[in-house]
Amino acid sequence: MTISPVIRLHPDDGVLIARASLPPGTSVADGVTTVERIPSGHKVAIKPIAVGEPVIRYGQIIGFATIPIAPGQHVHVQNIGMGDFAKDYAYCADVKPTPNFDLPATFEGIRRPDGRVATRNYIGILTSVNCSAHVASLVADVFKKNPFTGDNPLADFPNVDGVVALTHKTGCGMTQNEPLALLRRTLGGYARHVNFSHVIVLGLGCEVNQIGGLMEEQKLAGRLRAMDIQEVGGTRKTVEAGIAFVREALADSNKVRRETVPASELTVALQCGGSDGYSGVSANPALGAASDLIVRHGGTVILSETPETYGAEHLLTRRAVSREVGEKLVDLMRWWDEYTAREGAEMNANPSPGNKAGGLTTILEKSLGAMAKAGTTNLVEVLRYAEPVTKKGFVFMDTPGYDPVAATGQVAGGANLVCFTTGRGSVFGCKPAPSIKLATNTAMYKRMEEDMDVNCGTILEGEESVEECGQRIFDLILKTASGQPTKSESFDFGGAEFAPWVLGATM
């Protein structure tokens, strides 16, 4: 079977997507041939587009022509710009019943004493402030596995996935309002995270983010051990006390056993980074198909990255289960508009140089592709950054577009697994929630196979459908939740990627 050199995503589209680099003279539609080289994953016009006329992809506006565009021309930053247009939020218009499966899927999870289910079993070392970061790392390093030498200090504790220090750059020199509340919400979410069997929090002692205040505000009494370096007596004594805590915790943590649990215990963070022109064609829709399966099995998926939903939010408000939920999302978009304007920026500055090299032109185009990760089910809730996820189904969390910051908020909210799509090639990893990475195209997958878990480029090559790839992703999610290591786990990624959102002035 001959595969077309281009991909049409919607009957109304005025552009097609190149499956591979197309030389001039390539036939792409009836009576239309390329007049210049079209890079892989980029757009080619199939009809004349006048100045100011909308450019349509996915059946939606992705920008407006800044100069006349002829059929066969490359459509990108040289001839598309942003512009205002009316959006019909049509709250709740597309809400529909979500049919659940009669026989729920299962995985082998770790049932905690409080009934929650973990996918991993870590011991965590958190810090209240950057000033205690090095001490936390010194403690964790004693128990650190080396993926290159094979050294494993935890060999006698096979049911413990690791000891991880999650450090950050703030905790002091900050205002005691929303910035402090946001940090405490994040740390509280990690302290309660189901994938931690035991947690210790290390502070310096004089910081704004006092451990006592953190524990009181987040109701953490009895959940963790706390130490201040100044009170314990300095670096060496604190490190020794931290090591003693971990050694004591290891024996208890190793007692866990996996058991068969329903897929409804999954809370999956949906992420993308290093996106390209194929993201909205292959990996994101396939992850969306897997997301629908998770929701239909009673589980939860979390979409985030508010700036990368900008311009496509009207498609989500149609799926909101209530006007109140939909209006929460619209309010977030207005906040981000005002926030970026105060900083002298604009939302369309979001696409990175790598995004543009991969074929993405505007934030509207990027958002429409990114939104595909969330599938087709109803939007049941909209949350602030790092707020606990308490509802089953598809939820949205307000986060920046920067992947580590976004994922940190999702995991703080309770995600026990992350699915991360990438077109350019991200090496993101996460702890304590494992991260599955999905490649949008086969060329990148082969180039970075040691870092990629799933090749979704098979969709572009006609080897499988979006739904078939989505089923493959769902099956891998169940295996990963059951303990099968991801590619990022093989390199021990995940500690350095803890990145709480920092708001406000540093003083």
Question: What function would you assign to each model-found segment?
Answer:
Residues 1-417, 426-428, 432-507:
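Metallocofactor- and cofactor-centric catalytic cores in central/energy metabolism, strongly enriched
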